[in-house]
């Protein structure tokens, strides 16, 4: 069984504040391409991600879409109970829809947030229960994903754990490919 941890920037770190922002379509396009490649190579059974707004929720959406055509499953894990309680109503609704749609949902802590140890426990759970990771993260533009990136780097010192890092250069290249494909599909 091949289990993939998918994480990356939060939506605000990519300056995406609307569901119809074209950057979201590009990120989903990149993730879909990567997931399909892994599926077709027999390297993907589970997409396991968090519930943060941004790359993690988009990865879950892509996983659910692909599960209509491929034998893959999608899981969302959160670091503590009541994860989305402080979000606005629209974001809570998106979270609840995803939570109800995925194949598996759980929290790595049975309590609401009380301190950062829950976040570290979540990270450790994710890396120990997956076989590889995909991150949308650019080392030249640090953000929240740096904590996951640093953990993966440390883990790789003692374990085989492939990391596919998608940076802004690759996103730009894929944005051009995405636009070209859309243009060709229109005619």
UniProtKB/Swiss-Prot annotation:
InterPro entries: YspA. Transmembrane segments: none annotated. Belongs to the UPF0398 family. HAMAP family: UPF0398. This is UPF0398 protein LBA1157. It comes from Lactobacillus acidophilus (strain ATCC 700396 / NCK56 / N2 / NCFM).
């Amino acid at each position: 069984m091949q289990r993939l941890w998918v994480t990356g920037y939060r939506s605000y770190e990519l300056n995406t504040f609307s569901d119809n922002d074209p950057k979201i379509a590009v990120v989903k396009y990149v993730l879909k391409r990567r997931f399909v490649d892994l599926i077709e190579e027999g390297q993907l059974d589970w997409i396991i991600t968090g519930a943060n707004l941004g790359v993690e929720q988009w990865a879950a959406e892509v996983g659910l879409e692909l599960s209509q055509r491929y034998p893959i499953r999608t899981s969302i894990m959160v670091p503590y109970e009541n994860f989305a309680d402080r979000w606005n109503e629209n974001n809570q609704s998106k979270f609840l829809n995803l939570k109800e749609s995925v194949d598996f949902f759980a929290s790595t802590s049975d309590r609401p947030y009380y301190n950062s140890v829950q976040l570290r426990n979540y990270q450790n759970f994710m890396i120990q229960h997956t076989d590889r990771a995909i991150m949308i993260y650019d080392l030249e533009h640090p953000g929240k994903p740096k904590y996951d990136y640093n953990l993966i780097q440390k883990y790789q010192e003692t374990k085989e754990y492939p990391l596919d890092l998608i940076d802004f250069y690759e996103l730009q290249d894929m944005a051009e490919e995405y636009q070209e494909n859309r243009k060709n599909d229109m005619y």
